[in-house]
Swiss-Prot record:
Protein name: 3-isopropylmalate dehydratase small subunit
Self-association and partners: Heterodimer of LeuC and LeuD.
Upper taxonomic lineage: Bacteria, Bacillati, Bacillota, Bacilli, Bacillales
Pathway: Amino-acid biosynthesis; L-leucine biosynthesis; L-leucine from 3-methyl-2-oxobutanoate: step 2/4
Organism: Listeria monocytogenes serotype 4a (strain HCC23)
Any one Gene Ontology cellular component term annotated for this protein: 3-isopropylmalate dehydratase complex
Length: 193
């Protein structure tokens, strides 16, 4: 997992509430188990017209928002069926940070396990951030747990374990390898019984 200590990036806002995993990535695109190649299908039914041309009215298609790495969105983001592909699609598209009012528990966990930092902020803060100009950067300061922007600085909460994983770029496998000596010692002990 790629570390996130301080992330500086541009934003795009999709302020809908209750965006479910089928809207994030439709089930028709879930026929692979590789983690890459899903970004082109992110928000597919909204991003594309029936003829597969980009929908000019969809925020992610705005020419001045093409460099966005921070998605600002509504409440209950990632609700619906458990679908790790949704986190893969967001990351593959290039989003490193999602700022929402709340998340489905399973979706939140899928994001944290796949290197997408889910931040919870109140609606008032998100509405201000949603109005930031396309050429402005927003800073996510994870060690100090702050979203810093021209419209304000907003503190956020994150579990200490997840914070450590993001700051150090550790996924579950990397954490397991940190304990490899203890694992080997246990295996030798069990094998000798």
């Amino acid at each position: 997992m790629e570390e996130i200590k301080v992330h500086i990036g541009k934003t795009v806002a999709l302020m809908n509430d209750n965006i479910d995993t089928d809207q994030i990535i439709p089930k028709s695109f879930l026929k692979r188990i590789e983690r890459t190649g899903f970004g082109e299908f992110l928000f597919d039914s909204w991003r594309y017209l029936p003829n597969r041309k980009p929908n000019p009215d969809f925020p992610l298609n705005a020419p001045d928002r093409q460099e966005a790495t921070i998605l600002i969105t509504g409440d209950n983001f990632g609700c619906g069926s458990s679908r790790e592909h949704a986190a893969w699609a967001l990351l593959d598209y290039r989003f490193r940070v999602i700022i929402a009012g709340s998340y489905s528990d399973i979706f939140y966990m899928n994001c944290t396990k796949n290197g997408v930092l889910p931040i919870v902020l109140p609606r008032e803060a998100r509405e201000k951030l949603a109005k930031i100009a396309a050429d402005e950067n927003v800073t996510i300061d994870l060690p100090n747990q702050q979203v810093i922007s021209s419209v304000g600085t907003y503190p956020f909460e994150i579990d200490a374990t997840w914070k450590n994983k993001f700051i150090n770029g550790l996924d579950d496998i990397a954490i397991t390898f940190e304990h490899i000596d203890a694992i080997k010692a246990y295996e030798q002990k069990v094998d000798s019984i």
